[in-house]
């Protein structure tokens, strides 16, 4: 069994973004036709009791408060969170680590590049490596997600490289192949994928998606130039390291023949019209077989 909780579904800045009066953010703030969302993160478990966090969003404290499954019970302090797995070193994937600094043991997993980016920033020393050990992920090699007591959780994790880029704060050092990861998690029978950032959909990614049972995929933008057209930013989706949902080479087109998995769009930017519940774009992706992620959504992959 694999249980999944969507802790957050939005891209960096959240929905609504704190400084935005764009139509989507106004709709979310006033609760008129669009639901607010925190920044993208998942919780996964094999038993519904011990959980692993996929990306530590800046909203992680509130996400934990809003998720009873992540509440500690019993002793004065503790947590059912066993570990955190990072897909990249972007600010909206790592900032929440600082919320977990209260001398609480858990395992922190990421690529060599991401763990080095954390090591290069002394603020993350607040997570004492003696208490929060760093575990480098070896690409394309399955590893058991271990509970804090040293017992296997029942989940196997495989990290794989996907096209992307270095975080904005680290771009001067250039990009490495392990800057952006996809995660495959299996209980031996069912498999889920988490790919919240992807600059190009390769044939390998299509093969992985076709074989999976549940897929969370990059839904940042509807079209590559939408932020430019809206006057929100001079950056395109490609400049930010993201394919766009409805463009040629995007997930709607590339995964049309992938009929096995349930497909969920996550990491959705506040400019994306699929966030409007009655928009034509929302109807288009739903007709194409996609679910638009919302905070608090739960999924279960049952083992036969």
UniProtKB/Swiss-Prot annotation:
Q: Does the keyword Zinc apply?
A: no
Gene3D superfamilies per UniProt: Ribonuclease Z/Hydroxyacylglutathione hydrolase-like (3.60.15.10)
Spell out the Pfam families in the cross-references: Lactamase_B_2
Family, similarity comment: Belongs to the PqqB family.
Record key words, sorted: PQQ biosynthesis, Transport
Q: What's its job? A: May be involved in the transport of PQQ or its precursor to the periplasm.
Task: Write the protein's name.
Answer: Coenzyme PQQ synthesis protein B
Gene, per the UniProt record: pqqB
Source organism of this protein record: Gluconobacter oxydans (strain 621H) (Gluconobacter suboxydans)
Q: In which pathway does it act?
A: Cofactor biosynthesis; pyrroloquinoline quinone biosynthesis
> Does the record's keyword annotation contain Iron-sulfur?
no
The biological process GO terms on file are: pyrroloquinoline quinone biosynthetic process
């Amino acid at each position: 069994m694999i249980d999944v909780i969507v802790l957050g579904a939005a891209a960096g800045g959240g929905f609504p973004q704190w400084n935005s009066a764009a139509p989507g953010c106004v709709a979310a703030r006033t609760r008129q036709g669009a639901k607010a969302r925190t920044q993208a993160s998942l919780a996964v478990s094999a038993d519904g009791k011990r959980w692993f966090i996929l990306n530590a969003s800046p909203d992680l404290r509130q996400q934990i408060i809003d998720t009873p499954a992540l509440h500690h019970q019993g002793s004065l302090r503790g947590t059912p969170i066993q570990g955190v797995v990072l897909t990249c070193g972007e600010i909206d994937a790592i900032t929440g680590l600082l919320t977990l600094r209260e001398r609480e043991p858990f395992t922190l997993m990421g690529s060599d590049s991401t763990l080095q980016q954390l090591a290069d920033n002394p603020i993350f020393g607040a997570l004492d490596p003696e208490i929060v050990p760093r575990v480098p992920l070896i690409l394309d090699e399955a590893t058991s997600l271990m509970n804090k007591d040293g017992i296997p959780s029942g989940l196997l994790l495989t990290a794989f490289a996907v096209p992307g880029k270095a975080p904005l704060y680290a771009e001067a050092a250039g990009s490495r192949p392990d800057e952006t990861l996809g995660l495959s998690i299996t209980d031996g029978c069912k498999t889920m994928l988490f790919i919240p950032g992807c600059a190009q959909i390769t044939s390998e990614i299509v093969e992985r998606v076709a074989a999976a049972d549940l897929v969370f995929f990059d839904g940042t933008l509807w079209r590559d130039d939408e932020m430019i057209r809206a006057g929100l930013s001079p950056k395109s989706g490609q400049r930010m390291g993201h394919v766009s949902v409805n463009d040629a080479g995007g997930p709607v087109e590339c995964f049309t023949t992938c009929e096995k998995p349930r497909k969920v769009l996550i990491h959705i930017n506040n400019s994306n019209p699929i966030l409007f519940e009655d928009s034509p774009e929302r109807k288009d992706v739903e007709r194409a077989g996609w679910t638009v992620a919302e905070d608090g959504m739960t999924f279960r992959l049952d083992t036969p």
